[in-house]
UniProtKB/Swiss-Prot annotation:
It is an enzyme of class 2 (transferase). Its EC number is 2.1.1.297. S-adenosyl-L-methionine binds at G133, T134, G135, S136, G137, D156, N201. The keyword rRNA-binding does not apply. The gene is prmC. This is Release factor glutamine methyltransferase.
Length: 296
């Protein structure tokens, strides 16, 4: 948004209209929303406050900050990284370049975990949950916040990711019920440690699929949290094989995956022999997104 020599003031409305058009041309899927979030951040206000300020002219310092945010967003930086947080399951989750930005699709994993604990596993007085590849800790804190009697262990191989998860856990005052641990899948756990629910949003992108990801993902989010291997099922196969011994009797394994590998992943689970009631759950777009199963 260039400063012009005419006398037309850069009101909130004009800034939003210009930026929305700019982001639309850049291929943003939500250009108006992006513009509103960034302008609210630059002004230090809630997004809804913009709607009562359309005719106001932000201060020069705010416009300078906004222009920089717009420039970086135009280069592909995710909005969540620019403002430092993302709403997930009605919780504000801190994020940075070391963690994946929580996606709405992952809320279906949280919902499935909560449904299992409230339903079939409701007889367990203090349900235990393992979140593998916790990243920002979004899944772990969402489950813990929703189910006050639940104890959650959240693991990640990345120490920088765990730093962000620690901030989110402490910010939500969940340190007494969410334990963070550096671990490559199950390697860092106690040998006999078992859980009622194991859930994971693991790396599940194949190399060919990764190469086609938009710049905003490929160049700005951690490669190791996305890329699984040539087929995309490498980490999922490990989870299926190793979770059987880590689940309590009747425990539930819940995995987020790409719709492109949903069928083959379900087949792997069926061939494993350690699970029953294996089923896929669709996201709001109708794509098979969650693989859920009970220990046989």
């Amino acid at each position: 948004m260039a400063e012009t020599s005419n006398d037309t003031p850069w009101t909130v409305m004009r800034l939003l209209e210009w930026t929305t058009d700019f982001f639309r041309k850049k291929g943003s899927e939500s250009p108006r929303l992006d513009a509103e979030i960034l302008l609210a951040h630059a002004r230090g206000c809630q997004r809804i406050e913009l709607y009562t300020s359309f005719d106001k002219v932000p201060e020069e310092e705010q416009r300078v900050a906004f222009r920089e945010l717009v420039r970086r967003r135009g280069e592909g930086a995710p909005v969540a990284q620019l403002v430092g947080y993302r709403e997930f399951y009605s919780i504000s989750i801190r994020v940075d370049e070391n963690v994946l930005v929580p996606r709405p699709e992952t809320e279906h994993l949280v919902i499935e975990a909560i449904d299992q604990i409230k339903g079939r596993l409701s007889d367990r007085p203090s349900p235990t949950v393992l979140d593998i590849g916790t990243g920002s800790g979004a899944i772990a804190v969402a489950i813990a916040k929703s189910l006050p009697k639940t104890q959650v262990t959240a693991v990640d191989i990345s120490l920088t990711a765990l730093d962000i998860a620690k901030w989110n856990v402490e910010n939500l005052k969940l340190s007494d019920r969410v334990t963070l641990l550096q671990s490559d899948l199950f390697d860092g756990l106690e040998p006999d440690q078992t859980f009622d629910v194991i859930c994971s949003n693991p790396p599940y992108i194949s190399q060919s699929e990764y190469d086609e990801l938009p710049t905003t993902v490929r160049e700005f989010e951690p490669r190791g949290a996305l890329l699984s291997g040539p087929d995309g099922t490498e980490i999922i196969a490990r989870l299926l094989n190793d979770s059987v011994q880590r689940l309590n009797d009747g425990g539930q394994l819940i995995i987020e995956l790409s719709p492109m590998i949903a069928g083959v992943s379900k087949t792997l689970a069926e061939q494993n022999g350690g699970y029953k009631e294996i089923h896929l759950i669709k996201d709001l777009a109708g794509h098979e997104r969650i693989l859920s199963m009970q220990k046989a």
